[in-house]
Amino acid sequence: MRKRMAHFLNQKRSLLDVLYVYLSVSVVHSYNIDLEHPIVFGGPDSSFFGYSVLEHYHDNTRWVLVGAPKANSSYSSSVHTPGAVFKCRVHSNPERRCTEMDLGRGNKPRESCGKTCQGDRDDEWMGVSLARQDKSNGKILACAHRWKNVYYDSEHILPHGYCSIIPPTLQGRTQALIPCYEDYKQKYGEEHGSCQAGIAGVFTE
């Protein structure tokens, strides 16, 4: 009797396993990646070009935006490897050329960013993450999680992290975003860790 019961339970468990696998497979959505006709873009050596990648569409033009968080920037040549974001046109670009985007931050390694904020851009890793608003004419978010506030450098170096909000045209004035900075506030949970905003990013609206 026990053997029959054990055999019945094993059969039931096997049927449940098959049903579970079937249900799991039935909800999986797949898509094809064209391995025979890839579009390949390249960037500077040792720049981590491709660390983050984002598709962007504006004014009937398709772009691939690429983060290279260890790149030297042609717009910030005085800053030590701040990182860069490149734009690569998908069509009408037979040479597969990518150009660095000017985020409008100038050529100074240090920048004033508030009443008690002095930003240090060396090795900030701009382009570590990229995000886009999920709508037509969506803006772009490009972040540098290793950006530091050194205003209190005798006591604290505060790795707040920095993001640039880029217009959908990929040109013109960008908007600075430093979520973890507040005037006259020396700590932002640094006794437990570092904020480093921008290691990932998303638009909620």
Task: For the regions a language model picked out, list residue spans one by one.
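Conserved beta-strand/short-helix segments
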Residues: 2-205
